[in-house]
Design a protein with these regions (language model features):
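Conserved catalytic cores of very large enzyme subunits
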Residues: 2-749
Length: 749
């Protein structure tokens, strides 16, 4: 019998089992029209957003942190109901804060008490002595477990920054709960389903795997009950399904709020919610119980809450992931497996928040792109890119065959089947440093420690291809091995001491796991191998004979110019490293993947990487993601895109990040013309099978002015795309701002 909350909904399978894809496919309404239906912000939206902008200014004036908790450990019910301001409860169409005040950062010690306390003291807050005693004496954390088990080799590679950004001092993130489930089914049904799962796994042998799973599912059930209690604090009963659009938005947000109250993962993605919510909104519009103004207000207020998510971080984390990113990644667009466009009016509404409330890095709005998407939607998304530089594009046509048509982006660019999968985040291996180890015999140029295996160093003064390649292969093979072993240990400890119960409660118990790894310094390795192969690379040694630098004579092809000689090296490098990763056992039988992605950590990685044969000097930032090296692109934007498009997605299922800055004049004389040109660029790029594109549309002069005059009102929310996410430009360090300015801004296509 259909529940009254499901009135008018079609389909049967989703009613008898948790199956969001079946619900969505049976009930969504495609929209092929343009943006003319969109509504302006309501007075409530303007009032609330105005208050938040003032809080953001105060936060920046205080050094980046407005307020921080020191006495209460964050949890689902650690705080009572809280609102943006006094008397705003009625204005807020979506309610719920992480703590007891807006923009206040929670105290989360389970990832590591030292880090939680350091985050406090960095900004002038004194952590609780009582909590210090509890978590130092009686309660072990993820960070404690990891460092208790690390081998000397693991500590050495970490210390020498050939493995960097490992999730051993912070929450790993990248797990996307299917928050839609709370709205469609209500908590009581979800608890019952998990209880059935628990009951049906008891007949198996009580081996480690079964015992652990029983404990984890029990934790998930407790988390679901905690979510219900949390909602009751705000006066809502989420035990049953949502009855209308407002409840659907609120119920879904409560699911996400539970995640960010209990985890401080590096990526806390929202997932693919737009089409799902449109089903409820469209039903209410048809029934006459909701207007378009009210529908847009709901989405504006939901996005406002995503923009408010904050975590307490330590300085070393901020160096890697600068600008306070949350990766509240949220997808719009995409095609169904049946050939129907999945674009709805709600996809327009989410993009429209960047107009109603201005540009913002969060949520990390991602267009799942196909050239077959409705023309009006492609044009509107491109227009928003031209105006705000706030959204990224990912190729739905290469992801859909792998992940289906109900996947989410769980971090920056990596896909995961919503509610069916989880990912073990793996940071990055510095292949640029690995290349220098191949020459030095595993000795680090900065520390002079024997970090890598003591293989035979290159002895001559000229670095030949035949001498270099076997050494590089051996060194890369070693790095892949220690990389996987280190991640296996980290994720074991994270499951043990910092388990994501609130998120995994909204994912199938029989979960598929992927094991993410990553590559940093990609283009520098490609160009360096090209230099060794096609030019003459002389080794410059110091007084001890250590290979300190290189002098390259002659020309060589560079990746990023649509030159097959360089591009085939890039393809080889990706395939080779991925195959080396695959040779090793991965934790919980997870499926290994890799990415070419750096975030803003390319600056930090570069500091610890010596001179390279491609001409990159010691200490200089590495090129971000899969981008060509700085200054390498000589043949324009399209040639650069063509090079990146040759990298096979099937060997980098964790994602291939490409960030490009285009001068407005290169796209056209006005915004409409620029949007039309950008659609053509996107169609051509993605039809080649490429994976991802960050689009920035501005000139370098604007960046320079923002760097010198961050106080200007126009730059307070000036957002740019960097490798894998968006950030307010003035929130970057000066060093990172200079790095962005140094990148190619294409003046021609």
């Amino acid at each position: 019998m259909m529940k009254t909350e499901w009135r008018g909904f079609k389909g049967n399978l989703w009613q008898s089992e948790v199956n969001l894809r079946d619900f969505v496919q049976n009930n969504y309404t495609s929209y092929d029209g343009d943006e003319s239906f969109l509504a302006e912000p309501t007075q409530a939206t303007n009032t609330l957003w105005g208050m938040l902008k003032e809080l953001q200014k105060e936060e920046r004036a205080k050094g980046g942190v407005l307020d921080m908790e020191t006495e209460v450990v964050s949890g689902l019910t650690a705080y009572g109901a809280a609102y943006i301001g006094e008397g705003t409860k009625e204005l807020e169409k979506v309610v719920g804060l992480q703590t007891d005040k807006p923009l206040k950062r929670a105290f989360m010690p389970y990832g590591g008490i030292k880090m939680a306390e350091q985050a406090c003291t960095t900004y002038g807050y004194q952590p609780s002595e009582k909590l210090h005693e509890i978590f130092h004496k009686y309660c072990k954390t993820h960070n404690d477990g990891v460092f208790d088990a690390y081998t000397p080799e693991m500590k050495l590679v970490r210390h020498n920054h050939i493995l960097t950004g490992l999730p051993d001092t912070y929450g790993r993130g990248r797990i996307v709960g299917d928050y839609r489930r709370v709205a469609l089914y209500g908590i009581d049904f979800l608890i019952k389903e998990k209880q059935n799962d628990l009951a049906n796994m008891g007949d198996r042998e009580m081996i480690d795997e079964v015992i652990r799973l029983r404990e984890e599912v029990s934790m998930q059930i407790k988390a679901l009950k905690g979510l219900k209690e949390m909602a009751q604090l705000y006066g809502y009963d989420i035990s049953q399904p949502a009855q209308n659009a407002r409840e659907a938005v609120q119920w879904l947000y409560f699911g996400y709020l539970g995640a960010v109250k209990t985890q401080n993962g590096a990526a806390m993605s929202v997932g693919r919610i737009s089409t799902f919510l449109d089903i409820y909104i469209q039903r209410d519009l048809n029934e006459g119980t909701l207007t378009e103004d009210e529908a847009q207000e709901l989405i504006d207020h939901l996005v406002m809450k995503f923009r408010m998510v904050k975590f307490a971080r330590i300085p070393s984390y901020n160096e890697l992931f600068t600008g306070d990113p949350v990766w509240a990644t949220l997808e719009v667009g995409g095609m169904g497996q049946d050939g129907r466009s999945m674009v709805t009016k709600n996809d327009f509404r989410f993009l429209h928040t960047l107009e109603n409330m201005g540009p913002s890095p969060e949520p990390n709005l991602t267009v799942l792109y196909s050239s077959r998407l409705p023309k009006a939607f492609k044009h509107y998304a491109s227009l928003i890119s031209v105006k705000t530089s706030s959204i990224q594009y990912e190729n739905d046509d290469v992801m859909r065959p792998v992940w289906g048509d109900d996947y989410s982006i769980c971090c920056c660019v990596s896909a995961t089947q919503t509610g069916k999968e989880m990912q073990f985040f793996g940071a990055r291996a510095n292949l640029a440093k690995c290349l220098t180890y191949a020459v030095s015999g595993g000795v680090d140029s900065k520390t002079r420690e024997q970090c890598g295996p003591k293989y035979r160093a290159v002895e001559g003064d000229v670095l030949t291809y035949d001498e270099f390649m076997p050494r590089f292969m051996d060194m890369m093979d070693w790095l892949a091995g220690v990389y996987v072993k280190t991640l296996n240990l980290i994720h074991y400890m994270h499951d043990k001491y910092f388990y994501e119960a609130a998120e995994l409660a909204l994912i199938d118990t029989d979960v598929r796991r992927t094991f993410a790894t990553g590559i940093a310094g990609f283009s520098h390795v490609v160009d360096s191998i090209s230099a060794i192969k096609y030019a003459k690379v002389n080794i410059i040694r110091d007084e001890t004979g250590f290979p300190l630098s290189f002098k390259t004579e002659g020309d060589f092809p560079r990746y990023g110019n649509d030159d097959e000689r360089a591009d085939e090296i890039a393809v080889w490098l990706l395939k080779t490293f991925m195959n080396m990763i695959k040779k090793h056992h991965t934790y919980r039988n997870s499926e290994p993947t890799t990415s070419i992605l750096t975030i803003t950590s390319n600056v930090v990685y570069g500091k610890f990487t010596s001179n390279m044969p491609d001409g990159r000097p010691a200490g200089a930032p590495l090129a971000p993601g899969a981008n060509p090296s700085y200054g390498a692109e000589k043949n324009g934007l399209l040639a650069s895109l063509n090079s990146v498009a040759k990298l096979p997605y099937e060997y980098a299922l964790d994602g291939i990040s490409n960030t490009q800055t285009i001068s407005p004049g290169a796209l056209g004389h006005n915004d409409e013309e620029r949007a039309q040109t950008l659609v053509g660029v996107l169609d051509g790029y993605f039809n080649q099978g490429s994976h991802h594109l960050n689009v920035n549309v501005f000139g370098i002069d604007k960046l320079k002015d923002a760097m010198e005059h961050p106080e200007k009102e126009e730059y307070q929310n000036f957002t740019i795309r960097v490798s894998g996410y968006a950030v307010k430009f003035i929130d970057l360090t000066r060093e990172q701002q200079l790095d962005v300015i140094a990148r190619q801004a294409h003046e021609r296509l």
